[in-house]
Swiss-Prot record:
Catalytic center residues: R256
Effect caused by changing C337S: In strain: 4M-147
EC number: 4.2.2.10
Name of this chain's protein: Pectin lyase A
InterPro entries: Pec_lyase, Pectin_lyas_fold, Pectin_lyase_fold/virulence, PEL
Span of the signal peptide: 1-20
Species this chain originates from: Aspergillus niger
Post-translational modification: N-glycosylated at Asn-129 and O-glycosylated at Thr-88 when expressed in Aspergillus nidulans. The protein from strain 4M-147 is O-glycosylated at Thr-88 and Ser-368. PubMed:9195887 modeled GalNAc at the O-glycosylation site, a glycosylation not observed in fungi. The O-linked saccharide is probably mannose.
Effect listed in the UniProt record for changing D39S: In strain: 4M-147
């Protein structure tokens, strides 16, 4: 009886601990309603092979990372000839000649020798109905990114870090890739030292996506601007994409933070853009951006290319138009030692009607809140 009682008590403690593991909070914005792996029993991968298997199988899963999974040298290296479109100084990124990119797009760039890790070039496939969460500040994937593609849906990634993917090499790999997917919530994720894009949404529809409370850390020894500021931040290049960006910390970048085009509707709200040496936004043809309640601090150029449409709430009075489409007024953005933008296109705001819309708070409280809460370990 005594042993039975002890066993029962231990089992109860374990069950309570397991029940406590799961996603924190719920998605806001376009991906509202995503459930990921739901109430599936959590699994704890121990090896990189186990992690790849769990992420790519057909089961609904809650996958908990308790350590760093280092893929860096897991697939060997490739040596070859690339090119140096941005110069040959030690702080400049160089390009892998992927699909003859150097010949086709940079034929005048000097040739250089390259040696990169194969694991970084293509991310781990994440299939439908998955929650990938980190425990505390310890869950990380190093040397390889994540790919949510080919019809995958209902996925949550929360409280992890994705880092160190061939940082010297353009075309060396992306941190998080979405293409042809739906209902994806990425929250409290830190990305750092990435070869190409921290986030890239490809040319197929990515439907409902929420990127919230993430830390895009652009500090790097190598960059396309040769100044330690990473150029390739966030690239939203989809087809009928709906993207919410809220509460993110975009730091120390020099461009594409974000680049938006090709029939993408972006709601960019309450983000903190800090120390950007080049430009934050590029809005290409087919990019539709509502930007409200954001803070731009030490951003040289807030908007560079402008070929799409944007409403950036140029005044409090102007923000009243949003009540017709969002059910509330939009709030103005804040700027400090920074360029500004004051785009006033409202023709696309009707596209927000009937959709799940993130709330917005005044920009005055955004910077301190985002710095304290964004990224891994800040749930």
């Amino acid at each position: 009886m005594k042993y039975s009682t002890i066993f029962s008590a231990a089992a109860a403690v374990f069950a309570g601990s397991a029940a406590a593991v799961g996603v924190s909070g719920s998605a806001e914005g376009f991906a509202e309603g995503v459930t990921g792996g739901g109430d599936a029993t959590p699994v704890y991968p121990d090896t990189i092979d186990e992690l790849v298997s769990y992420l790519g199988d057909d089961e609904a899963r809650v996958i908990v990372l308790t350590k760093t999974f280092d893929f860096t040298d897991s697939e060997g290296t490739t040596t070859g000839t690339g090119c140096a479109p941005w110069g040959t100084a030690s702080a400049c990124q160089v390009a892998i000649d992927q699909d003859d990119w150097c010949e086709n797009y940079e034929p005048d760039a000097p040739s250089v020798s390259v040696e990169y890790y194969n694991a970084g070039v293509l991310g781990i496939t994440v299939t439908s109905n998955k929650s990938l969460i980190g425990e505390g500040s310890s869950g990380a994937i190093k040397g390889k990114g994540l790919r949510i593609v080919s019809g995958a849906e209902n996925i949550i990634i929360q409280n992890i870090a994705v880092t160190d993917i061939n940082p010297k090499y353009v075309w060396g790999g992306d941190a998080i890739t979405l293409d042809d997917c739906d209902l994806v919530w990425i929250d409290h994720v830190t990305t750092a030292r990435i070869g190409r894009q921290h986030y890239v949404l490809g040319t197929s529809a990515d439907n409902r996506v929420s990127l919230t409370n993430n830390y895009i850390d652009g500090v790097s020894d190598y960059s396309a601007t040769c100044d330690g500021y990473h150029y390739w931040g966030i690239y939203l290049d989809g087809d009928a994409d709906l993207v919410t960006m809220k509460g993110n910390y975009i730091y120390h970048t020099s461009g594409r933070s974000p680049k938006v085009q090709d029939n993408t509707l972006l709601h960019c709200v309450n983000n903190y853009f800090y120390d950007i040496s080049g430009h934050a936004f590029e809005i290409g043809e087919g990019g539709y951006v509502l930007a409200e309640g954001n803070v731009f601090q030490n951003v040289d150029t807030v908007l560079e290319t402008y070929e799409g449409a944007a409403f950036t709430v140029p005044s409090t009075t102007a923000g009243e138009v949003c009540s017709t489409y969002l059910g509330r007024d939009c709030v103005i953005n804040g700027f400090g030692c920074s360029g500004t933008f004051s785009e006033d296109s409202t023709s696309f705001l009707s596209d927000f009607e009937g959709k799940n819309i993130a709330s917005a708070s005044a920009y005055t409280s955004v910077a301190s809140r985002v710095v304290a809460n964004a990224g891994q370990g800040n749930l």
